[in-house]
Amino acid sequence: MAGAGLIAIKRRIKSINNTKKITKAIGLVATSKLRKARQKLELNNAYYSSVNEIMNGILADKNLEKGIYFKDNGVNKKLYIVITSDSGLCGGFNGNVIAKTLETISGDRENSVIITVGKKGRTYLKKFKIDSIAEFVEIPEIPTLKEVKAILEKALNLYMNKEISEINVVYTHFVSSVKQEAKVKKILPITMEEDSEQTSTFVEFEPDKNIVLEGISELYLKQTLLNLMLNSKTSEESARMTAMDGATSNANDLLDKLNLQYNRIRQSSITQEISEIVGGAQAQE
C-alpha cells in the first residue's frame, strides 16, 4: 500500500513541477511585456496630458461655438466600448471589466449598445445574453492608432447617424503594479475633465475655426481612446504577472507539502520493513 501511495505522490509532484514551469515562464513573459507597456503608457500620458489641456482650454471658452462633437444629439441610446483581453490567465482583470459594464448598464440595458475589444469580452458578455454590435480582436501587445482608428470609425458612424447619444469606454486604469481599477469614461460628447481647473482663455483659430476645431476634436478622441487602451493593456500584463507569480508560489507550497508527505510515507515504509526483518530474524533464533 505504501508503494502505491509513493508512486501516486511522485506522479503528482511531477505534474505540479511541469505546471510550475509553465506559470513561471508565462510570468516572466508578462513581466517583460509589462515593462514595455508601462514605458509606452508613461510616454503617452505626457502627450495626452498636453492634448487634454488644449481641449479643456477650448471648453472653458463659453463664447465659442463648439460643434457636433460637443453637443447632445437627443438620442436615448448610449454606446459602451468594453476593453478586455484576447487571452486569459490574468486573474480578475476581465471579470472586473465585465462587472463594471454590467453595473453601469443594469438600469437601462435596452438603451445600451456594446462594442467589445478583446476575445474575452465577447465570451463573457454572451454568458449574460448581451450581444455586441461589433468586435475587435487580436489587439497588438502595444495598441496603436491603427486599432484606435478602426474602433472610433465604427463608434463615430453610430454617433453621426444619431443611433447613439454617447460614447463611453469601460477600461482598466493602471495605478501601479499592484493596483488597477475598472472604470467608465465618457469620451463623446466631449466635456471638460471634472478635476480640471482650466480658466477661460482667448483662443484664436487660423485659417478656419471649424476646420481647426474638428481637427483638434478628432485628435483628442484618438488620443483619449489610445490612452485608455494603453492603460488596459498595461493593467492586463500586470494582472497576468501577479496571477502567475501567485500560481508559482502556490505550486511551491504544494510541492513542499507533497515532498514532506512523500518522505514521511517513505520513512514509515522503511521503518516497517526494518521492523519486519528484525522480527523475522528474532523468530528464527
Swiss-Prot record:
CDD domains membership: F1-ATPase_gamma
Domain of life the protein comes from: Bacteria
Entry keyword set: ATP synthesis, Cell membrane, CF(1), Hydrogen ion transport, Ion transport, Membrane, Transport
MF (Gene Ontology): ATP binding; proton-transporting ATP synthase activity, rotational mechanism
Record localization: Cell membrane
GO-annotated cellular components: plasma membrane; proton-transporting ATP synthase complex
Membrane topology: Peripheral membrane protein
BP-aspect Gene Ontology terms: proton motive force-driven plasma membrane ATP synthesis
Family: Belongs to the ATPase gamma chain family.
Subunit note: F-type ATPases have 2 components, CF(1) - the catalytic core - and CF(0) - the membrane proton channel. CF(1) has five subunits: alpha(3), beta(3), gamma(1), delta(1), epsilon(1). CF(0) has three main subunits: a, b and c.
Purpose of the protein: Produces ATP from ADP in the presence of a proton gradient across the membrane. The gamma chain is believed to be important in regulating ATPase activity and the flow of protons through the CF(0) complex.
Name this polypeptide is given: ATP synthase gamma chain
Organism in which the protein naturally occurs: Clostridium novyi (strain NT)
Gene: atpG
